[in-house]
Amino acid sequence: MFGRVVSGLVLVVGLVVAPPALADSGPPTAKFPPGFLWGVSTSGFQSEGHFPDSNWTRYADRKAPGVTDPYGDSVDFLHRYPSDLKLAKGLGVNVFRTSVEWARVEPRRGHRDPKALAYYDDLVRRIKANGMRPMLTLDHWVYPGWVADQGAWDNPRTRDDWLRNARYVVDRYKGQGVIWITFNEASAYIYKELTTRPMDLGQMLKMRDALIKTHRAAYDMIHKVDPGALVSSNVAYGTALNGIFDAAMFNDVTDKLDFIGIDYYYGANLQNLTAVHSLTGEFWKIDPEPEGLYYVLKNYQRRLPHLPVYVVESGMPTDDGKPRPDGYTRTDHLRDHIYWIQRAMADGVKMMGYNYWSLTDNYEWGSYRPRFGLYTVDALTDPTLARRPTDAVPAYRSIIAHRGVPSGYVPVRAPGWCSIEDPVATCLGTTPT
């Protein structure tokens, strides 16, 4: 998942960041190119259910800060993945992102669970059989209970243990066209650990250094074991994080990325400061800022012009599946963001792919209330865990089939004035249209 709370905490910092101005490109005319990667994202822990001992099962069991709902069996992807993959195939996507969970693969040090391996083997096989490319995350914020017992990232041994497990997983799935993500949103990973277990500044810095060193080692290992594979680590949110977290982490791994992975959910401008709701976990109260994605993409492309850009996660939460009070639908949100990606492409951004978060609703780090799924699931009240399509299912299918929104599309949500993503251009210049 994503660093939504982290983003909210540093919105003010973003006002001092000045990424490139919005060019007057007009409505998009170019379609997404053939071979563009359209996908859906999820993570193992958040969707699988029936989860072994881990840091996050412990956080859920003890109701750590931010945890309001029991984990239960989540949406039972562990047993329903064959039918869920059919739903993904029906969208027309060609990428399916999930995570190979260390806690499931190695529930005890040195012991690999054959049932877990059989599950992941079949999952990867079925992803490919359904015409999709696997995007596999090696660490989506979850580690085994025995790693927690040894001090997690406070203990230097964890880095070696992590790399040993990663080598095993990469060895197992090499040569299958996997796109590898080492760490999901490393800076948000640190923040989430900080908010769920006691950590002091020294521990935070130790974890930061460990994640940087581990990613760098993993990048080299993956290219040795799986030559030609694409490897990255996705960055949470975008330019509002640059002032703090990019300086602390992203800048230390830019030479070990094959593409720029971006997760974008919301921005802010002087007409829209609703991102403060991220501090309370009420993400559905945030008014989306689709045009902010344009600035984020342009900014990262400017910084790393030799790399293509992939939106690894993007989506919109609703309050337990209820319609937004302002009438802005999941379809509106999806189309508006695709529009701004096409604007960015028209202005030179080398887009590689786009993943929607998520295929189904899932466990959002302590709560089932935020609903992000293209297919909604009542995890707490429906024992059948039925997948019910939202309005965005046919919309995404049409976008993929027609390679974008049509020429002349006008965003439902108009750009705001004085965006945090580009304060110089948007506060002093003309509001984009």
Residue ranges and their predicted role:
Residues D76-E101, R133, R303:
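Catalytic domains of carbohydrate-active enzymes, especially glycoside hydrolases
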Residues K63-Y71, E101-R104, R197, V276-T280:
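Short glycine/proline-rich turn/loop motifs
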Residues G72-D73, H111-R112, M207, K285, ...:
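A generic structural signal for short
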Residues L91-A118, L136-D139:
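Aromatic-lined carbohydrate-binding/catalytic grooves of carbohydrate-active enzymes
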Residues M1-A23:
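Secretory targeting and sorting signals
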Residues G66-R80, P156:
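Active-site mouth loops of central-metabolism enzymes
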Residues S25-D61, A118-P325, D332-P432:
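Active-site region of glycoside hydrolase catalytic domains
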Residues P20, S41-S43, S99-A103:
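Acidic/polar N-terminal loop/beta-strand segments that form early-domain functional surfaces
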